[in-house]
């Protein structure tokens, strides 16, 4: 449900009839998820990429167990050429250290934009690689030259997935997204400097709808493991791996991931997500402090329903427990390298249960804790992260009125969180934040 849809009087009326409000909530969430999963966005809806996709090969490879797709956006401004050098490093030193075999095919769309690098030749633009063992990412080794390509366009992602599926069909598909990232926040993830574009979360969901989803998504970006980002994938992926905090340039260890997958090509999407998350610990540098793997199935739906109940009860009891909420929010863990508005979901429930006297809210929190333990398949963090458990949620502070220039004021003035995210369509958390910010 979109936050802001109710006015304050509606919230007050809901206090009297809150039990009626619960009726059918689980059904509503399940129906919305099912409808979203059934929709397919027409290609005309998606903005076209700068360059058309190349012709598909007439003779596709035999069907593999897995096709691993890596969407590598290195088209950054000249001040971030270090990211571009890691693009070449990850292909040559990690992905090509294992390469493809009959069970696991690996394809990469790598965009260096207009900023040439001496590594592997000074090619620019975007190239598609079918990665074989020992390969280097030179122009001569590219399967296709896509030229100037907008990696921030959902159509580019659709074209890449379609190309990979047609040329390298498989029983399962994994998609790794490689770039900077800032969670659900718009105009920050998959930045394409040449096109001045970003792949925002609503566009990502559109693209995944258009290709009928994948089996597993790996976020080789910062701040991805939030319940809001997970909601964008629900219905179009079975599991995801990433970090609820910032990550270093090393990110995933693709060598470890591909070695494990080739050794056990029958592994499930959930198992692959765990392997991917574990690889962050194996190859982490001093900037990668946390990683987790999350299941996006029915248990995730139940967790989202529990968070919706919690958001509703927090909203209708706000006047009674505002101070207790503030204490709980302040005490809840916030990964040190992420936005200060993000809080660890599990720790939020722990602190609310400890500081808020409402029996209903305590029950809601207990339900959230129980379900998150089932949803998080594996998680790891260094001690400096504090008591984090694998999933963040957005909960900004609430100055009254919002202070000029505060991040909360920015959110209140910019309705993306309320209007464009699947999470706020499915739950009442956005309604709570709207009331909380007043």
Where do the protein language model's features map onto the residues?
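Cleavable N-terminal signal peptides
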Residues: 39, 49-50, 220
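Signal peptide processing junction and immediate N-terminal pro/mature segment
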Residues: 43-55
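N-terminal extension/subdomain marker
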Residues: 54-169
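Residue-level detector of buried hydrophobic side-chain packing
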Residues: 94-95, 175, 220, 393
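Short acidic, glycine-rich surface-loop motifs adjacent to enzyme active sites
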Residues: 171-185
């Amino acid at each position: 449900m979109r936050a802001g849809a109710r006015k304050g009087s509606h919230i007050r009326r809901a206090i009297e009839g809150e039990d009626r409000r619960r009726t059918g909530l689980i059904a509503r969430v399940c129906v919305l998820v099912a409808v979203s999963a059934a929709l397919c966005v027409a290609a005309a809806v998606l903005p076209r990429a700068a360059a058309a996709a190349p012709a598909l090969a007439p003779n596709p490879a035999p069907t593999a167990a897995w096709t691993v797709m890596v969407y590598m956006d290195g088209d950054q401004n000249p001040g971030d050429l270090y990211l571009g050098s890691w693009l070449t490093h990850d292909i040559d030193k990690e992905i090509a250290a294992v390469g493809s075999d009959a069970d696991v095919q690996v394809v990469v769309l790598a965009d260096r934009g207009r900023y040439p690098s001496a590594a592997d030749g000074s090619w620019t633009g975007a190239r598609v690689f079918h990665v074989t063992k020992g390969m280097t990412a030179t122009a001569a080794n590219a399967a296709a030259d896509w030229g100037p390509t907008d990696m921030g366009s959902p159509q580019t992602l659709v074209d890449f997935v379609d190309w990979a599926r047609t040329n390298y069909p498989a029983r399962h598909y994994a998609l790794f997204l490689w770039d900077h990232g800032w969670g659900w926040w718009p105009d920050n993830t998959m930045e394409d400097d040449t096109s001045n574009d970003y792949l925002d979360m609503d566009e990502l969901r559109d693209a995944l709808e258009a290709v009928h989803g994948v089996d597993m998504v790996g976020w080789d970006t910062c701040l991805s493991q939030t319940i809001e980002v997970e909601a964008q994938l629900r219905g179009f992926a079975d599991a995801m791996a990433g970090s609820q905090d910032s990550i270093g340039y090393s990110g995933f260890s693709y060598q470890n991931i591909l070695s494990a997958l080739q050794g056990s090509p029958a592994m499930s999407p959930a198992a692959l997500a765990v392997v991917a998350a574990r690889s962050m610990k194996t190859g982490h540098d001093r900037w990668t402090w946390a990683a987790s793997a999350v299941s996006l199935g029915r248990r995730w739906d139940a967790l989202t329903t529990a968070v919706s109940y919690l958001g509703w009860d927090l909203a209708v009891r706000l006047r009674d427990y505002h101070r207790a909420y503030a204490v709980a929010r302040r005490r809840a863990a916030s990964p040190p390298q992420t936005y200060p508005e993000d809080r660890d979901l599990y720790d939020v429930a722990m602190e609310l249960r400890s500081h808020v006297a409402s029996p209903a809210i305590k029950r809601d929190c207990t339900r959230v804790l129980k379900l998150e333990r089932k949803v998080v398949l594996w998680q790891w963090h260094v001690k400096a992260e504090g008591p984090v458990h694998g999933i963040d949620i957005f909960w900004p502070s609430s100055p009254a009125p919002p202070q000029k220039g505060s991040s909360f004021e920015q959110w209140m003035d910019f309705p993306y969180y309320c209007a464009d995210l699947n999470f706020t369509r499915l739950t009442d958390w956005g309604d709570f934040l709207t009331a909380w910010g007043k």
